[in-house]
Every structure is written in structure tokens, then in C-alpha cells.
Amino acid sequence: MTTTAPTTSGPARAPHDPAPHDPARVRDVVGVGIGPFNLGLAALSAPLDDVDAVFLDAASEFRWHPGMMIEGATIQVPFLADLVTMADPTSPYSFLAFLKATGRLYPFYIRESFYPLRAEYDAYCRWVAARLGSLRWSRRVIAVEHDPAADAFVVRAETLAPDGSVTGTEEHRGRHLVLGVGTSPVLPPALRALADEVARGEHPGAGPLVHSAQYLPHRDALAAAGSVTVVGSGQSAAEVYRDLLDGVHGDARRPGYRLDWVTRSPRFFPMEYTKLTLEMTSPEYTDHFHALPLELRQLLGREQRGLYKGISGDLVDEIYDALYRLSLDRPVPTTLLTDTEVVAARYEPAARGRGDTGAAGEPDAAGPAGEYVLRLRHAQLGREVERRTRALVVATGYAASVPAFLDPVRHLLRFDELGRFDVARDYTVDDARRVHVLNGEEHTHGITAPDLGFAAWRNAVVLRTVTGREVYPVEERIAFQTFGLPDDAGPATAPPPTASRTADAAASAAAAARAAGEAR
């Protein structure tokens, strides 16, 4: 008896490049970036005869957060939040179709968990990508221009060899441009300069100093360093800490090994899964948030990050249980510091003529030749201390930015006073409604921007704009609660002079900002 079935069902596998490139062809859509959001748009576009689309990415193939593909880790949304189901439950590109095609539908059913493994979600996306003919890999977009005569965008891309060298250039023309370029890792200011110094090789023999996005390639070196400090408070920080705490890659019982966790969050906040809170990932709340003044959106945005960047409650419990188990025979060499910010950092090489020692004072000849010295400030106490560590994992999140390749068309785009995209409710950033942004609109649309569960709905809105018709039903109301005031609440009145909503919101947001799931 076999445990897996051959891959026979599902949409046929697409060729890598189904047709010769025609630079004069004007498509309906040119997408830049092939992460889950643009991949979902490609899948929803595939069956549409009136949408001619192509999607470009510099990568050679689909890979979703490869640096955090930790064994056993799950995604934090149910399997229904796949690439297509929330827009088209009958799509052949659904997660359930993938499970059926790969012989894993019944095992998944018996497993009785709504949350797929992270590696499983990556395999699903790769399965979908292999079956779409609209994807062009190894294309690095270098410039976007506008051709008024053709009323189309001209997307210039370098073609890349497997080693990353440039082999040529291409032009792709499209009436609509969809930006799905994702976000980039962010380091706190106190660590940026030091990380750059290490990357430039200015500290020979220094231990790893990496963002969590690059955790797996450095995991063995981190575990071998002798002492590791994790900075951050969200799911990524928790997963790295748990992975290094004990087991194959880290062992808190090993002589000289030390693992610390530092966050400026007041506590290790779990992600909130209560149902009325989840209604904030709805079209109605997105409408409400988008209509608020910029200043209030700024405050609410900082406050609400903890709603989707917290830690899985199960993982919090698992970490505690591991610490409890490890502490049975002796204290665990670990320190968990909350409400504590890294305000400065430097590297100190080992003193000449003496062997380096680990954070716990044990000799460790195999470890790095020096230590990182972190200056930490405790917010409540107002005091600063220094802590030493041989390696650092910085799990402080990601941020969106405006790609440089848009410089030739910046005059066509809208920006707010902080230089960010001024994204309309329909996800466009130009007055002609031709340039669409996916996951670059958290400051205008709130917490639905990075949400995998809302991506299919957003893509249905994009396709409605592209085609001029509602290809997939776009729900307008799904929530039981009302955000703002009901329509029959009577005429609006100003708050009394003594009530300062902005001041109250600012105070609330200041406290909540430290609780943000990916806070430094």
C-alpha cells in the first residue's frame, strides 16, 4: 500500500515559457513580483478569456519565506485563505485541489487542523505556479515607463541566468500595472550600522548577525556560536527562540550555551483570534479605516499591528512547557526581557592572548572570536544595561517601500505627505486607475493589507477594475458589527471641547506600539 498518490488531477502543468516573447504585444495586465498575492491574481486571471496577463519576478522559481521554513511551523490563517477560494471556491487552483492532486486530502482531513504547515503552503503555491502559463521567472524589472500613444505601461526587465548574471533585456507592455513586490526586512536603527559593518566583513570572525528572514541558512552557525540573542516579539521571534531552545539545532543544556530573548513589547502578546476582532479583516472595516484622517490612521495602524503580528497562543504555551521541562534539574541559561529596547550596539573582538568565553563563562574555542555588546533600555525603569552575545537574530518585521523602477512614472502616481503610496479604496495609486498595489497599503487600508485571507477579495476588486465587470462576486458586507456610527444614528455632532480624541488615541497608540507583534 502506498501513502501518497501520483499527481494526476488538477490543471495541466504549464510550460515555462508558453510562447515567444513579443515586445509589441499590449496586455491587459503586467504584474511585477510573484509572491502569494500576485500568484493568486494570476490564478484568478487564468480562466478569463478577456484578461491577457503576464507576471515577472527576478527569482528563478517560487519560494515563500525560505529563511523561516522551520520544521513543523504552520501558517497563521486557515486553509480557506489560499490563493483563490475566498473569490472562487470552484477554482482548480485551490488548496483542496492541491491536496486532492497530491493524494493528501484524506490525511489532511484526518489531521483535523485548519492551519496548513508552512512548508505545505509553500508546496501548494509552487504547485499552482507550475500550472500557470503567465509567469515569467528570472526577470528583474529595472524601469517602468508610460507610452501615451499606446496608452500602456512599458515594463523593462533584465533576463537573468541561473547564476544571476544578466543575459539580456525584455519589454512588456500592459494597460494595467499590478505591483506585488512585497516588503523588505527591517532592522532597528541601533543595529543597522553594525549589521552593515558585519556584512562588509569589517569584523572578521564575528558571529552571525542576521534578520529572521535569513534564519535557516545561518541556523547551524547560530547554534554553534555559544550564545544567541533574539530581538523581536512576533511569531518569527518566537519560532526562532523555540527552535534554538533545545533539540537538534540548539540545546539550552549544553555547557556554555545561552539563549536570550529581548523585546520592547510590554509582554509576549498572543495573536488575537476572537471572532468579533477578526471582523476587522472585513470590507466594512477596511472602508471605515480608509475614510479616516491620515493622523488617526497612523495611530490606529500602530495600535492594531498586534492583532496580526502577535504570537500563536499554542507556540507561547509550547515555549513555556519547554522551559518548564528544561528547568527540572537545573536553571535554564536563558533570559526573557520585555519592555526592553536595544538602543545601541557594537562589536568587541576577543582580547589578544586570552581565549573567548561564552555568555555563561564557559570556554568555547569553536565559537566566534568576539562578542556583540548590546545597550538595553528598560522603558518602565528608565535604566540601561549592557548585555553580551556572540550572535544575533533580529526578528523585527518588514516594511513596504516605493520601488526605484517606478521613478520614470512617479509623476503619474499619488503619494502622501510621508512619501508613501496614496492608495485609493480600489487599490489604485494613479488617477487613471491603472496602477494597482498589493500589500503596500497598510497605512491606507489597515490590517487587511498583508492578510492572506483577504488577498482573494482584493484581487477580485483588481479584476473588476481591469475588466469593467464583476468577474468574481465582491462582497460589500460580511460583518455583524457596525464600524463608526449606523446610518440611522442621527446628525453628527462635534465632541465636547474637553474630549481630545487625538490625544487619547495617541496615548493608547504609544503604549500599543510597544506591543506590536514585530516590535523591536
Language-model features and meaning:
Residues 2-60, 108-235, 239-497, 517-520:
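Flavin (primarily FAD) cofactor-binding/catalytic cores of flavoenzymes
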Residues 60-61, 80:
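Non-catalytic nucleic-acid substrate-recognition regions in nucleic-acid-modifying enzymes
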Residues 64, 95-98, 127, 457:
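Tryptophan-centered motif/residue detector
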Residues 65-78:
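Glycine-rich phosphate-binding loop and adjoining beta1-alpha1-beta2 segment
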Residues 77-81, 85-93, 268-271:
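Short, solvent-exposed beta-strand-terminating loops
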Residues 86-121:
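A conserved beta-strand/loop capping segment in the N-terminal third of enzymes
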Residues 501-520:
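Long, low-complexity, intrinsically disordered segments
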